[in-house]
Amino acid sequence: MPHVICEPCIGVKDQSCVEVCPVECIYDGGDQFYIHPEECIDCGACVPACPVNAIYPEEDVPEQWKSYIEKNRKLAGLE
């Protein structure tokens, strides 16, 4: 399962996650970064790099941020 960037990223966009991603699947989505779900290899390198704890494995996204799964897919052009 891919990782998902959620609400805490909005307005922060620290780029630490971008720098550690080995497959460069994290992109600028305007107000936040997003992870392309078809490019993510599920390595998890981005999770500890995020200073605002905005990144989760898709299956572990907190209930209040479940909409970010679809938002990441839309930003990636998959919906």
Swiss-Prot record:
Q: Which residues bind [3Fe-4S] cluster?
A: 9, 17, 50
Q: Which residues bind [4Fe-4S] cluster?
A: 21, 40, 43, 46
One GO molecular function term of this record is: 4 iron, 4 sulfur cluster binding
Q: How does the cofactor bind to this protein, according to its record?
A: Binds 1 [4Fe-4S] cluster. Binds 1 [3Fe-4S] cluster.
Q: Identify the Gene3D superfamilies for this entry.
A: 3.30.70.20
Domain 4Fe-4S ferredoxin-type as annotated: residue spans = 2-30, 31-60
| KW Transport (keyword) present | yes
Q: Could you tell me what this protein does?
A: Ferredoxins are iron-sulfur proteins that transfer electrons in a wide variety of metabolic reactions.
Q: Which PANTHER family match?
A: FERREDOXIN, OXIDOREDUCTASE
What is the name of this protein? Ferredoxin
Q: Which organism is it from?
A: Thermus thermophilus (strain ATCC 27634 / DSM 579 / HB8)
